[in-house]
Curated annotation (Swiss-Prot):
Keywords: Cleavage on pair of basic residues, Disulfide bond, Glycoprotein, Growth factor, Hormone, Secreted, Signal. Residues 21-63, 64-233 form a propeptide. It comes from the Eukaryota. PANTHER family: INHIBIN ALPHA CHAIN, TGF-BETA FAMILY. SMART domains: TGFB. GO terms for biological process: hemoglobin biosynthetic process; male gonad development; negative regulation of follicle-stimulating hormone secretion; ovarian follicle development; regulation of cell cycle; regulation of cell population proliferation. The lineage of its organism: Eukaryota, Metazoa, Chordata, Craniata, Vertebrata. The gene is Inha. It comes from Mus musculus (Mouse). Gene3D superfamilies: Cystine-knot cytokines. GO terms for molecular function: growth factor activity; hormone activity; inhibin binding; protein-containing complex binding. It is found in: Secreted. The record marks R63, H64, R233, S234 as: Cleavage. Its main location: secreted. This is Inhibin alpha chain.
Length: 366
């Protein structure tokens, strides 16, 4: 049986190069196979469990945007139950605080400040639960020893009257992480456009790695809708992933068919869900893939007007080796990279990676 890797290699040889000469129609499956081959070559195969996974592992949903949210497909749609992930807009960095702290430090030390901006979705919905995930860097033994003498973590909120304590309870979390469950009386804090949290942890170490960034998890449900809101919700949603770039692509005015025959930069909206990688590559959910496509015969508008009595002289593309066939390809040095965020443990940690030379900027017959 031919493996998936061999099949991708075969499709890659068939496509030869995304920016090379192609027929009048570039098969979408071949483009997707080329894109998958480029991603696998740059990032390697995804190191993840299967779709089922270990039932004992708590899987966090995709965290791809500040204030972004996703609906639980298992819940009835009319309930509008959702889960939102909030990353801090700003926060204390390791340049501002020491990397290690001792047991005899003063209470003012070990204070981490984070500014959150709850989205309009969260502020317009009813919060049913909220947790703050914070990377302590401490093992379970250190956490137990600290809790036996004094609370390891204290959470405060900055208000007009100064810092105020936030009622929380410590829950179960993965190693070196603390999960603080906010009490119901603290849920109204998420209705403010700006939320400044101060977390005091004298024993915690400061880390500037992206995968240790703290975040808020908020479960929300819709408030009682009005008649107008119910009518708007009845409108079917867009069944495909979209982005602002894809929306601009759909809103472009139609072009002449002849413009697509000559060498030009084509675009294809590709989602990682379509590639089967939405549990591996969590941001962006989709992107616009640009590639070169079309023939290299001179377009009619560029041909010189015929002169009576003079035989026409064929126009040759510039910068070609004599006898070589021109090819629609990307200009050297014009390829752009794509930055993605991946996870290999279901959402507990993230990794920022770069796929080089993926998106074409300029095309020409060379």
């Amino acid at each position: 049986m031919v493996s998936q890797r061999s099949l991708l290699l075969l499709l890659l040889l068939t496509l030869r190069d995304v920016d090379s000469c192609q027929g009048p129609e570039l098969v979408r499956e071949l483009v997707l196979a080329k894109v998958k081959a480029l991603f696998l070559d740059a990032l390697g195969p995804p190191a993840m469990d299967g779709e089922g996974g270990d039932p004992g592992i708590r899987r966090l949903p995709r965290r791809h945007a500040v204030g972004g949210f996703m609906h639980r497909t298992s819940e009835p749609e009319e309930e509008d139950v959702s889960q939102a992930i909030l990353f801090p807009a700003t926060g204390a960095t390791c340049e501002d605080q020491p990397a290690a702290r001792g047991l005899a430090q003063e209470a003012e030390e070990g204070l981490f400040t984070y500014v959150f901006r709850p989205s309009q979705h969260i502020r317009s919905h009813q919060v049913t639960s909220a947790q703050l995930w914070f990377h302590t860097g401490l093992g379970r033994k250190s956490t137990a020893a600290a809790n036996s003498s004094a609370p390891l973590l204290d959470l405060l909120v900055l208000s007009s009257g100064g810092p105020m304590a936030v009622p929380v309870s410590l829950g179960q979390g993965p190693p070196r992480w603390a999960v603080l469950h906010l009490a119901a009386s603290a849920f109204p804090l998420l209705t403010h456009p700006i939320l400044v949290l101060l977390l005091r942890c004298p024993l915690c170490s400061c880390s500037g790695r992206p995968e240790t960034t703290p975040f808020l998890v908020a479960h929300t449900r819709a408030r009682a809708p009005s008649a107008g809101e119910r009518a708007r919700r009845s409108t079917p949603s867009v069944p495909w992933p979209w982005s602002p770039a894809a929306l601009r692509l759909l809103q472009r005015p139609p072009e002449e068919p002849a413009a697509h025959a000559f060498c030009h930069r084509a675009a294809l909206n590709i989602s990682f869900q379509e590639l089967g990688w939405d549990r591996w590559i969590v941001h962006p959910p989709s992107f616009i893939f640009h590639y070169c496509h079309g023939s290299c015969g001179m377009p009619t508008s560029d041909l010189p007007l015929p002169v009576p009595g003079v035989p026409p002289t064929p126009v040759q593309p510039l910068f070609l080796v004599p006898g070589a066939k021109p090819c629609c390809a990307a200009l050297p040095g014009s390829m752009r990279s794509l930055r993605v965020r991946t996870t290999s443990d279901g959402g507990y940690s993230f990794k920022y990676e770069m796929v080089p030379n993926l998106i074409t900027q300029h095309c020409a017959c060379i």
